[in-house]
Amino acid sequence: DGFGWTPMHFWVMQNNYELLELAIKGGANVDMQTLLDPKSEYNETLLFEAVKEAETYRVTQLLIELGANVNFITPTTPLDDAKGSRNKKLLKDAGAMTSAQLDKKYNIYWDSEECEKDESYMEKYCKLLNDAIKKAKESE
């Protein structure tokens, strides 16, 4: 659709982990993003959608098992948005952090005033933090 939603996004919302598993194991991107902001390359992934509802914890578990990035930042993270104790536990067990924890770990500060002055600030912030996380994972 116009927001970049695919059948996979709807399967997440419907808690249809069987079709999601088939699609991802068949080559679909586990970190597929919506296009809520077409100007941004950092929109919510399937995992963000899964953790928004406590009932979709099985989808959350599947996405994590299949390699979803638990620390993707938009500037919030899936853990910031998570509903339900099972989703939060699954994320934490997989190493997920809140955006504040990531900011502190990578010494990157979110400046909301700067964001109001410079529309590209959020994009730059997300890119910097996602790149830092990716490099840290590669060096582990």
Named regions from a protein language model:
Residues 1-8, 33-49, 72-81, 102-108:
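Ankyrin-repeat boundary/"N-cap" motif
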Residues 21-29, 61-69, 92-97:
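Ankyrin repeat domain, specifically the short helix-to-loop turn at the C-terminus of the second helix
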Residues 2-23, 28-30:
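Generic detector of contiguous secondary-structure segments
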Residues 10-16, 41-42, 49-56, 81-86:
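Ankyrin repeat A-helix N-terminal signature
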Residues 66, 83-140:
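Ankyrin-repeat-protein effector appendages
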